[in-house]
């Protein structure tokens, strides 16, 4: 018999309930009000009273309303059909909700995440008599561009034997495809889909590896200077309007991964709508089909209830872990984790907990760490390797990187891509600061060469600050040349034109080739009669390199420009 309760207090989206029976932490419940069932989750248990955060607007909830507990944690449904979908934080398919409710979402309407009527062409890879454990493959269906493996549900803890498995054919997600038997002789029916709690990491693998293989983003400044590894973590903090969302969209389009999951948690509705409109029209460079075929979007805009923001982050990472179990490489982009932290701050305040810095809860760091730690590269039971790479954008107020959310994130991520107002105002894209950013991972360029080039940026910035005080006349010709070289590196290599078909995505081969050209210019000693001649010469080199960036790799125009560049360099080189 299900546990019942009644509402005894309402404070915003925090509801206090008097319980008649046993309940557990994070259990899902439904509040019956005005003919609707509103979904909520227990976040604190005290004696015979519990506090629950409601995933909907709480208008109309009154003292005495009946509450029914489900005895289940907040779960997601995992199975074929997740890709191409747009979900809210509770995994309701938004296009289906729009058909049922119109464009304005109604409270208390929850739909099944996966299409139960669609038939999937199942091809078996296991046979009767095979011994299996949780996470082992029974067969696969083709979903978009990936082989979607049908697995033994992750909650099955024993060893089983397959006693029945269907022949190849078309089946829906609810049809039985196999029967397995445990050691005690009890039989279990297996379908293509199952549920898994979002706050419990999926750990059905042999071992975790240290992330080492670079995840190519085809953005030069990231791959060369601040690389991200497959199974690694990175964050993109920056002030409003610095280009975080655009950088994430470019990364999702060009990254060397099988599946992209976008968690738009608390981002402005306009930006989410832009993503939803653009992605179906974008062409995946790897397959030539729509980018949505390998994408799943979880969106909770800033206008939706705050409690669902937290759910959207966990829903996204759980779906990512599910696809990792198939031996695929996943990229999860959370935009923005600051809004999620603000939702936590709101709930913490309502629970009257002792606040930490800037009123964020004292446990902010551990919650953020537990989310990023679910990323990783793993060896599966069958020897395949899968990875989940997590990138979270952070929106610190005023671009202040010292605030708690940024600092808590910096402690757990492996790469930091800090965007600055100064660079974005100067129309430099990506606006990643080459002076403040860092990475612990190995990139596509030799680290010693990259460090040498970066030293020019540091020196160039110091000389630039000096020139602002004393002018060009107050510095030596040698220092002025270092400054010009740093400007050349910045404009020709660090910046990219994401609207140009060639320059938007740069392969690792081309990055190595172009970096060597720039590196040789940095190492070359030049001789000039005065500073004006030096500036004119470096501007000519810069224009030549920019034209090369917009030319197809090693075609006639590219080779001609490279030859002209080489002649220019030899003209002023000190032998």
Curated annotation (Swiss-Prot):
EC number: 7.1.2.2
UniProt keyword Ion transport, yes or no: yes
Pfam family, one: ATP-synt_ab
CDD domains: ATP-synt_F1_V1_A1_AB_FliI_N (cd01426), ATP-synt_V_A-type_alpha_C (cd18111), V_A-ATPase_A (cd01134)
Enzyme class: translocase
GO CC, any one term: proton-transporting ATP synthase complex
Signal sequence residues: none
GO molecular-function terms, A-Z: ATP binding; proton-transporting ATP synthase activity, rotational mechanism; proton-transporting ATPase activity, rotational mechanism
Catalysis performed (reactions): ATP + H2O + 4 H(+)(in) = ADP + phosphate + 5 H(+)(out)
Keywords per UniProt: ATP synthesis, ATP-binding, Hydrogen ion transport, Ion transport, Nucleotide-binding, Translocase, Transport
Binding of ATP, residues: 238-245
GO annotation terms (biological process): proton motive force-driven plasma membrane ATP synthesis
Biological function: Produces ATP from ADP in the presence of a proton gradient across the membrane. The V-type alpha chain is a catalytic subunit.
Family: Belongs to the ATPase alpha/beta chains family.
Protein name per UniProt: V-type ATP synthase alpha chain
Organism: Borrelia garinii subsp. bavariensis (strain ATCC BAA-2496 / DSM 23469 / PBi)
The encoding gene: atpA
